[in-house]
């Protein structure tokens, strides 16, 4: 899994011009799945995201997790995180997970994370418009492939 984690003051996702979900302070996640992903990747990502300390404490140090600040998560599926750009000028997305597998993993990821932190989600495969107010900005890329190699 590849997940872009953005610390936000607020974020929302709209479909057909109507807001589907919105959150206040927390994380906006862009979640990509590949066919090689497994429950290991899913569990690793959930644990890392729930415990990642990138919110400022009273001393202005990044020392608090999304749980600590009682934040929320907006999760958006994004197969384009697996774009291959080595050849030509049009990206290939063949490395992205097959839709039926990716959707199941994405939904399981959201359900698992929601047991720890409030999670709202976009619609898998939909054309969505995402608005956010970055906080920092702080943007982190989590790639579970590295953890899988070292497991």
From Swiss-Prot:
For this entry, the protein name equals D-aminoacyl-tRNA deacylase
One Pfam family in the UniProt entry: Tyr_Deacylase
Give the residue interval(s) assigned to the motif Gly-cisPro motif, important for rejection of L-amino acids.
136-137
* Source organism (scientific name): Lactococcus lactis subsp. cremoris (strain SK11)
State the function annotated in the UniProt record: An aminoacyl-tRNA editing enzyme that deacylates mischarged D-aminoacyl-tRNAs. Also deacylates mischarged glycyl-tRNA(Ala), protecting cells against glycine mischarging by AlaRS. Acts via tRNA-based rather than protein-based catalysis; rejects L-amino acids rather than detecting D-amino acids in the active site. By recycling D-aminoacyl-tRNA to D-amino acids and free tRNA molecules, this enzyme counteracts the toxicity associated with the formation of D-aminoacyl-tRNA entities in vivo and helps enforce protein L-homochirality.
Q: Where does the UniProt entry say this protein principally localizes?
A: cytoplasm
Q: Which domain of life is it from?
A: Bacteria
Q: Which GO terms describe its molecular function?
A: D-tyrosyl-tRNA(Tyr) deacylase activity; Gly-tRNA(Ala) deacylase activity; Ser(Gly)-tRNA(Ala) hydrolase activity; tRNA binding
Domain observations? A Gly-cisPro motif from one monomer fits into the active site of the other monomer to allow specific chiral rejection of L-amino acids.
């Amino acid at each position: 899994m590849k997940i872009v984690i953005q610390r936000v003051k607020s974020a929302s996702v709209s479909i057909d011009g109507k807001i589907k979900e919105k959150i206040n302070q927390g994380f906006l996640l862009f979640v990509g799945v590949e066919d090689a992903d497994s429950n290991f990747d899913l569990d690793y990502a959930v644990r890392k995201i729930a415990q990642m300390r990138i919110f400022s404490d009273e001393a202005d140090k990044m020392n608090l997790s999304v749980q600590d600040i009682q934040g929320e998560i907006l999760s958006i599926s994004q197969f384009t995180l697996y774009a291959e750009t080595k050849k030509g000028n049009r990206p290939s997305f063949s490395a992205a997970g097959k839709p039926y597998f990716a959707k199941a993993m994405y939904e399981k990821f959201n359900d698992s994370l929601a047991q720890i932190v409030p999670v709202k989600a976009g619609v898998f495969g939909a054309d969505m418009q995402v608005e956010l107010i970055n906080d920092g900005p702080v943007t982190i890329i989590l790639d579970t492939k590295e953890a899988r190699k070292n497991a």
